[in-house]
Amino acid sequence: MISSNDFRTGTTIEIDGQVWRVVEFLHVKPGKGSAFVRTKLKSVRNGNVVEKTFRAGESVQQAVLEKSNLQHTYVESGDYVFMDMTSFEETRLSSDQIGRGSKYLKEGMEVNVIFYKDKVLEVELPISITLKVTETDPGVKGDTASGGTKPAILETGAQVMVPLFISVGEMIKVDTRNDSYLGREN
């Protein structure tokens, strides 16, 4: 249990069976009445943000999350198989459990998996990854002057918008948080 007075940004708590991360908190002492803590909570499972007010000193169940560094080894019948780099145990996750990041996974990639009570809550990919362009329209000389973009399909099947001068076979850096092109990889 944790007191609402001890909330800090990043603290994880459990309310009604759901795990929430404290995004913002403000301890308020009104001139009249008792003190309270106003918080902004983000659901770890789906990313929803809600505002909730707690009485000062109110006890809340703290959620202790476990973070494991796992390596993606292969895909078998729709499940992504990961290996724990310390215990060498295998963990199988569906694309639903991984979320939108599944389109960036390739063999050998290391990810952080967050567990709560032995259930997967979240899969954290690296912020930027380098992937090969496998399909895109050919670039024409002089295209860079307009500053436009075109769709490109990467080796994992993900689609991102890239500048017109990018061609098939080039290695590019991609931001996994918002699917944006970051630059060429040398």
From Swiss-Prot:
One of its GO terms (biological process) is peptide biosynthetic process. Keywords: Cytoplasm, Elongation factor, Protein biosynthesis. Pfam families: EFP, EFP_N, Elong-fact-P_C. SUPFAM superfamilies: Nucleic acid-binding proteins (SSF50249), Translation proteins SH3-like domain (SSF50104). The keyword Glycoprotein does not apply. Its main location: cytoplasm. SMART domains: EFP, Elong-fact-P_C. It is found in: Cytoplasm. One of its GO terms (molecular function) is translation elongation factor activity. One of its GO terms (cellular component) is cytoplasm. Disulfide bonds: none annotated. It comes from the Bacteria. The keyword Protein biosynthesis applies. Pathway: Protein biosynthesis; polypeptide chain elongation. InterPro entries: Elong-fact-P_C, NA-bd_OB-fold, Rib_uL2_dom2, Transl_elong_fac_P/YeiP, Transl_elong_KOW-like, Transl_elong_P/YeiP_cen, Transl_elong_P/YeiP_CS, Transl_elongation_fac_P. Involved in peptide bond synthesis. Stimulates efficient translation and peptide-bond synthesis on native or reconstituted 70S ribosomes in vitro. Probably functions indirectly by altering the affinity of the ribosome for aminoacyl-tRNA, thus increasing their reactivity as acceptors for peptidyl transferase. Belongs to the elongation factor P family. PANTHER family: ELONGATION FACTOR P, ELONGATION FACTOR P (EF-P) FAMILY PROTEIN. This is Elongation factor P. The gene is efp.
